From Swiss-Prot:
It holds the Pfam family DUF1444. This is UPF0354 protein Bcer98_3354. Disulfide bonds: none annotated. Transmembrane segments: none annotated. It comes from Bacillus cytotoxicus (strain DSM 22905 / CIP 110041 / 391-98 / NVH 391-98). InterPro entries: DUF1444. Belongs to the UPF0354 family. Coiled coil: none annotated.
Amino acid sequence: MKMTNKKMKKELMERLARPEWEFHYDSEKDVLRIEQKDTKKGINVSLPGVVAKWEVKKEAAIEDVVYYVTEALLAMHKEENQSGKIFPVIRSTSFPKEAEEGNPFIMTEHTAETRIYYALDSNKTYRLIDERLLQKLGLTEQQVREMALFNVRSLNYEFKQDQVAGNTFYFLNTNDGYDASRILNESLLQSMREKISGDMVVAVPHQDVLIIADIMNEIGYDIIAQMTMKFFAEGHVPITSLSFIYEDGEFEPIFILAKNRKKTNGKEKG
């Protein structure tokens, strides 16, 4: 049998077929590229070179290439996972507790409305850490929690500010996927506590916003309730429509309905 570049390409693609890998062929250079779908990292294989080796080593030449490419791509994937940073993400308590049956996510209770999950971030995307991924990473749950809290403190924060009826509202919205996660940055909360005169109210209506409010009057509570409900309804990953009083390092949910009262004949009408 005469081996050609075309036949070799077909042979390699069949032997290297994996759902997480994809192939790209440069017909001008006769180069087959095998790369990871998610990271786009990969290996280039010169088909004429493999064909030349096949003329001498036959089947062993193909086996050598398959082994080399497989090991290299698996090593890249492992390196990608290990080099990824771990961050905490805030989710609603109604969020699933398992990636699939028998494979629970790594979680920590947070408030009556929220729960902390942990994400392995590889710059372009992130994956929530479940027990199977935890084993692959070779980490303990405690190590994951410590790394996540350390990394969330490294995230920058710059608030936009708005004042309404004597109340001040601070908004954080960087869209990096971890805006709500900054609620776990204790030093951030303490620095905000020092500049707040009234009640400190915190809200994480969805993944991409953190609201901190300096509430001075009842109108302020109405505004934060309406605001949180609006953000919750609009969020891509909604968390909770409730806001929280923050005091002494604790979050207490505010069970308050947004009111839009009108006065009729001197009486309040709901």
